[in-house]
Curated annotation (Swiss-Prot):
HAMAP family (alphabetical): LeuB_type1
Function: Catalyzes the oxidation of 3-carboxy-2-hydroxy-4-methylpentanoate (3-isopropylmalate) to 3-carboxy-4-methyl-2-oxopentanoate. The product decarboxylates to 4-methyl-2 oxopentanoate.
Name the UniProt record assigns to this protein: 3-isopropylmalate dehydrogenase
EC number: 1.1.1.85
One GO CC term on file: cytosol
Classification of source organism: Bacteria, Bacillati, Bacillota, Bacilli, Bacillales
Amino acid sequence: MSYKIVALPGDGIGPEILSGTLELLKLISEKYHFEYHLESHHFGGVSIDYYGTPLTNETLQSCKNADAILLGAIGGPKWTDPNNRPEHGLLKLRKSLNLFANIRPTFVTKGASHLSPLKQDIVEGTDLVIVRELTSGIYFGEPSYVKKTEALDSLKYSSQEIERIVRIAFNLANRRRKKLTSVDKENVLSSSKLWRQIVNDVKKDYPEVEVNHMLVDACSMHLITQPTQFDVIVTENLFGDILSDEASVIPGSLGLSPSASFGQTGTRLYEPIHGSAPDIANEDKANPFGMVLSLALCLRESLNQNDAANELESIVYSFIQSNKTTADLGGQYRTSKIFKLLKEKYL
């Protein structure tokens, strides 16, 4: 079987971290004997420069036909038109592909716990995933307005929107340590009451998964004081936005964190959580590990290459443990040197 992969290098450091990652993918495919077809398209700010839009119809159609999308990074101060920003392309892509679930792993190995801003004995062994609903909730609710003396946002969820994200979280927990924490604000919000009800209903289909309901304020505290208690966390859009950013600092650098966006079926999108960092673009300083770990997610979730994903993750964590890192992690290695060493593991 041959997989179709679309590469979207994007802006800033995106092209340099993705190009090295694609070279790794080629070596991994040769070792693990799978085939893929690769297409690359301009996306984000660079697409605005070339075509006047952050997402062309050709690029969108290519993405719709893909098994997986690998995205570098988008955005930067160069593109200031509020009606034609690079980020609009990503929002349109997510909506067109119905990517309603954002998956963000947070992992701290014994050898990397010293990088965390938290105490080592607190973070060591952290291995959690936050599943965030991505396309509904207060960010998309109507009516929404700002007037001179008042403003309104609307928080709305349907049972179908809740159930589909909850099932993705249950399936993920079922493959991991079988612990699911559902985060809401059930003591105050009507939408959270429905959320909790749906979680309890869906639980009947997953008898082996232990479910714990937690209020969002309590969860935000426990993420800092006892992150190792969590396996899979599922929550709505606003809470997930905040909690996933909070969790992302636990490993010690935004450059370490991968992410994925899933729909019910079809194409899945993989990207590091960091921005385009235009201040260090083309300076060979970018931390590539978030992009490389996003490839590992892609190998596992879209290409059915679990062994390859596990090996790649182990190699990255061994590099961190031995301080083969870029400056943001306290190392002295350039981006190109990291990729050279990574590729040598497959030669």
